[in-house]
């Protein structure tokens, strides 16, 4: 007699405010929306949306990633976000604008890009 497999039902969360972490590198932009404790609620990236190669690093790809993450965060009734931006990429500003345009109220913007106090040696200069 085969036992029935019970699936865990997904509990519908109701989170009013959260934190939008935008990680913008030279190659990609990742947008992750978490609750106040840091548990991931929604995420998206330029690569996950189907952008490949150098198109991932464009501001338009970052805008689309932020819109997708905001849309799935608004499904659980999220209204306000505090934005933290990390990295030197080109999609920083467009991702913040896309979050606001999607209907999320941006309460604060914080730059948390790590700056070394003369840490490890950087990679050699590119000769193109």
Curated annotation (Swiss-Prot):
GO MF annotation list: rRNA binding; structural constituent of ribosome
Database matches in Gene3D superfamilies: Ribosomal protein S11
Keywords: Ribonucleoprotein, Ribosomal protein, RNA-binding, rRNA-binding
Pfam families: Ribosomal_S11
Gene Ontology CC terms, in alphabetical order: ribonucleoprotein complex; ribosome
Listed GO biological process terms: translation
Keyword Ribonucleoprotein in record: yes
Keyword RNA-binding found: yes
Function noted in UniProt: Located on the platform of the 30S subunit, it bridges several disparate RNA helices of the 16S rRNA. Forms part of the Shine-Dalgarno cleft in the 70S ribosome.
Family statement: Belongs to the universal ribosomal protein uS11 family.
Binding partners and assembly: Part of the 30S ribosomal subunit. Interacts with proteins S7 and S18. Binds to IF-3.
HAMAP family in the cross-refs: Ribosomal_uS11 (MF_01310)
Name recorded for this polypeptide: Small ribosomal subunit protein uS11
Species: Leuconostoc mesenteroides subsp. mesenteroides (strain ATCC 8293 / DSM 20343 / BCRC 11652 / CCM 1803 / JCM 6124 / NCDO 523 / NBRC 100496 / NCIMB 8023 / NCTC 12954 / NRRL B-1118 / 37Y)
